Curated annotation (Swiss-Prot):
It is found in: Plastid, Chloroplast. This is Small ribosomal subunit protein uS13c. It comes from Porphyra purpurea (Red seaweed). Coiled coil: none annotated. One of its GO terms (molecular function) is rRNA binding. Residues 97-126 are annotated as: Disordered. Residues 101-126 have a biased composition (Basic residues). GO terms for cellular component: chloroplast; cytosol; small ribosomal subunit. Located at the top of the head of the 30S subunit, it contacts several helices of the 16S rRNA. InterPro entries: Rbsml_uS13_C, Ribosomal_uS13, Ribosomal_uS13-like_H2TH, Ribosomal_uS13_bac-type, Ribosomal_uS13_CS. One of its GO terms (biological process) is translation. Its main location: plastid. The gene is rps13. Belongs to the universal ribosomal protein uS13 family.
Length: 126
């Protein structure tokens, strides 16, 4: 089993797809990496030799931010937005949608489950 960037790649999948298991690598970036290393995209992960694995690893380390580095960069960006109190930072802090979506309805993913508020009660008759 090939282990690249701390991720065990699935043995029986094509290398083009297996690379997408690494955080920060999608299908287009996977194809780009394979083109740089001159590895056929149809090779199964279990059929890679050590030299091919090393070449993929070298390109990933030199050219791309992946896994922990990328996650750290994203969290630092969000913290920076919150510290300088931008609109997006305040929305992150409140746990609300950031990009202009409506919140009166349909914001359940960011806001969590429904919290029922009691309705207005009628005054008792005399």
């Amino acid at each position: 089993m090939a282990r690249i960037a701390g991720v065990d790649l699935p043995r029986n999948k094509r290398i083009e797809i297996a690379l997408t298991y690494i955080y920060g690598i999608g299908l287009s970036r996977s194809k780009e990496i394979l083109k740089k290393t001159n590895i056929d995209a149809d090779i199964r992960c279990q059929n890679l030799n050590d030299q091919q694995i090393v070449s993929i690893r070298e390109i990933l380390e030199s050219s791309y931010q992946i896994e922990g580095d990328l996650k750290r960069f994203e969290s630092m960006s969000i913290k920076r937005l919150m510290e300088i109190s931008t609109y997006r930072g305040r929305r992150h802090r409140l746990g609300l949608p950031l990009r202009g979506q409506r919140t009166r309805t349909n914001a359940r993913t960011r806001r969590g489950g429904k919290k029922t508020v009691a309705g207005k009660k009628k005054a008792p008759r005399k």
